[in-house]
Design a protein with these regions (language model features):
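Glycine-rich SAM-binding Motif I of class I
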Residues: 176-177
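Conserved class I S-adenosyl-L-methionine
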Residues: 165-172
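Non-catalytic, mostly N-terminal accessory regions of nucleic-acid modification and defense proteins
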Residues: 1-164
Length: 177
């Protein structure tokens, strides 16, 4: 899809700075979470945002240069300290995009231009799957396998909180990581 291609093209720009595909998908996931939380807090949804003011999407849009990079790094750190699901999502999160101009471009030119909450779930899923597929093709020589980032696996295990002796079935998980 055009969205996957747009996301992938930007990934290639960041790759030139030494950012791995896994790091790109991880950073994209954090930023999309913040953007979609912001969208859900606005009309027509008007839901309370789980993101504390000052660490939210709008705070990122107001900054650029080193101020943006410093604020984003601090926001990830603070969000990782929050209780509940929010803390789990951002636990051990780090900014891997060291060039503030590229971080700003990712935020303003790529992510902010889309209304992600209005996109069909299939479109978002296809975009994420497309990135993982392109990653697998590029990194693994086209093995056709999708590799789930370790941080995502750890977050899913924390959310499910399996007890010893319990099994969790996900028929779509392939090898399970």
């Amino acid at each position: 899809s055009a969205l996957v291609q747009k996301l992938w093209n930007y990934c290639n720009i960041l790759r030139d700075d030494g950012l791995s595909y896994g790091d790109y998908v991880e950073q994209l996931t954090y930023l999309l979470f913040l953007k979609m939380a912001d969208e859900q807090s606005r009309p027509p949804h008007n839901r309370p945002s789980p993101i504390p003011k000052g660490f939210d999407w709008r705070s990122l849009l107001k900054l650029d240069g080193d101020d943006l990079e410093t604020h984003y790094r601090h926001a990830l750190e603070e969000l990782g300290k929050r209780p509940g699901m929010l803390g789990l999502i951002f636990r051990k999160a780090q900014n891997k995009i060291q060039d503030p101009a590229k971080l700003r471009r990712l935020i303003v030119d790529l992510i902010n231009k889309e209304e992600w909450s209005r996109l069909d779930a299939d479109v978002k899923g296809d975009a994420y799957e497309g990135l993982l597929q392109k990653n697998a093709e590029d990194v693994k020589g086209g093995a056709g396998q999708y590799f789930t980032p370790r941080a995502l696996i750890a977050a899913m295990v924390d959310v499910m909180a399996p007890q010893p002796g319990q099994s969790i079935c996900d028929p779509a998980c392939g090898t399970g990581g």
